[in-house]
């Protein structure tokens, strides 16, 4: 999306979303590379149109929004600049779930009064067990995480694995749990339904024109699926 899509933002601001993820990750690079836009102006412009809804960004931990590790002072200044320009929720992940690459971000977020959402990169291997995810979740909590995100960036989660994860995190970690499932494998809508039933607090969706494929389930689909339930 580009800045010219701003007319939809006031309507989105009235929906009541927990947050709108509008910045960080690859969007910082791609808005310059393909749209010739200033990412900081883009952020300020979006925030001006969404005064009632917190904006969220994705940080790659020590990589921030780039493709290499940055120093502690750069992490500190970048996070605080993002907060000043409109970001409130900072979802921070490390692809290897290495807590050392999250520490500098976490400290800066807490210092500037942002919401630190610690993200757990979900994948499947002999070492990626439920206990390993819970252990990392506890490390994020110890760093001061305000919420935890299960980040299924490759669409590998299944509905019943999702249910087990959510129940275990609610029992052992006790922070609001956020489910982030890409639609790649087609199971994301079912994962969100099982997550809701198991007690997840938040789920990521996208508006229908930008949903499905490598994106997320459509918000319209999830709203319809939850109608006439206690999650409506």
Q: Predicted segments — roles?
A:
Residues 4-91, 95-232:
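Catalytic cores and adjacent flexible loops of soluble metabolic enzymes
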């Amino acid at each position: 999306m580009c800045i010219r899509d701003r007319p939809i933002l006031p309507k989105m601001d009235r929906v009541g979303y927990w947050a709108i993820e509008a910045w960080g990750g690859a969007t910082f690079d791609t808005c310059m590379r393909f749209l010739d836009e200033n990412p900081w102006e883009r952020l300020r412009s979006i925030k001006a149109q969404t005064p009632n809804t917190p904006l969220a960004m994705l940080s790659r931990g020590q990589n921030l929004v780039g493709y290499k590790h940055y120093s502690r002072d750069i992490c500190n200044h970048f996070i605080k600049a993002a907060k000043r320009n409109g970001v409130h929720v900072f979802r921070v992940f490390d692809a290897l779930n290495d807590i050392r690459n999250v520490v500098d971000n976490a400290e800066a977020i807490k210092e500037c009064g942002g919401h630190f959402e610690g993200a757990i990169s979900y994948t499947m291997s002999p070492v990626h067990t439920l206990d390993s995810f819970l252990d990392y979740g506890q490390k994020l909590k110890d760093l001061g995480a305000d919420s935890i995100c299960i980040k299924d960036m490759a669409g590998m989660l299944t509905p019943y694995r999702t249910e087990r994860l959510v129940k275990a995190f609610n029992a052992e970690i006790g922070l609001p749990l956020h489910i982030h499932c890409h639609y790649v494998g087609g199971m994301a809508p079912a994962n969100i339904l099982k997550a809701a039933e198991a007690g997840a607090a938040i789920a990521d969706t996208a508006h229908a024109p930008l949903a499905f494929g490598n994106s997320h389930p459509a918000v319209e689909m999830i709203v319809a699926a939850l109608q006439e339930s206690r999650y409506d």
